[in-house]
Structure formats: C-alpha cells, structure tokens
Amino acid sequence: MMMTVLSLCDYTGAWSQPYVDAGYDVVRVDIKRGQDVRLFEALPFPVRGVLAAPPCTEFASSGARWWAAKGEQSLLDALAIADACMRIIAVHQPQWWALENPIGRLRKYLGTPRMAFDPADYGDPYTKRTQLWGHFREPVMCRVEPVEGSKMHLLPASPERAALRSVTPAGFARAFFEANP
C-alpha cells in the first residue's frame, strides 16, 4: 500500500517534495491551489504523516509593526487556518506530524515549539529562524556558515514575494524526510 502524507498550506510544495521524489502519495492542500484546509474532509484511508505550514503573515515577528493596523480579524482568520491544521492532524492520527512557522506569536496559541532551526543548520547558507511543533524525529543537522545572512528581507516587493519567503529550505526538507520517512 502506498504511504500517504498530507501537506497543508505548502503552496510551493518544497517541504513535501522529498516525499514525492520517494514515491509517497502526497496530498497537497492549499488555498492557492483551490483547497481550503478549513473545509478539508477526513481521508478514508491511513495517513503516515502531516506537514503543516500555515501562512505566517499574521504570526511572524518580522511583521509585528503591522499587527495593530491589520486588526483582530486578520489574526482570527489566521488562527482558524492553524486550528484547521491541528484538527486535520487530530482526525488522522498520523505516525508523525509537524507544524512550522517563523519566530513569532503563534507560540502564544500552540505553546512551546518542539524545536527551532535556521536553514544554515541543514546546509542552506542563510538565516530565517523557524519553529516546529509536533510529534516527529528531529532531523540530523548539517550546519554550514550562513554566508548569505538574513536574505529574506532583501527580496524586492512583488506579487511573488510572500511565496518566495515561504519556501521551505531544501536542506531542511530533505533532512526532515530522512528522519521521518
């Protein structure tokens, strides 16, 4: 039987790509692909793992200066997406699961993360501190110097900027897959 992995809010598919490459059945659910995690219905078969990356716009500390201007409703909408991810995890009871988000206020709602990392910890030479909650084996680190620094804030304003900032680093995606097949 083919193993299934759910990939939630992973528009780029970068985090789940190692599973696709290894022959897993990866079900990607993302609003930008026309599927809303808040409306996702339980699958009628076992799910081995769940990767969840709810949008960070309302949670990441890098955007804190805009939180007040956006108001409470945008936070409530973002929390509804994170809650939907947690509901999907609870319903499917996978062998492993992880929910990621950059350093920010999501920890106020989910508690202390299981781990935090920078892309440089897994071979990608830049920094972007990211937290993970869940039940999973921690990936083996392969640290390199972050010679590119914090390059995410240097991306020019464009319609693709948010998607580019949200791409899971390839080194981390591969290491996570190897630790959680």
Set out the residue ranges of the language-model regions.
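Conserved active-site and SAM-binding loop architecture
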Residues: 1-181
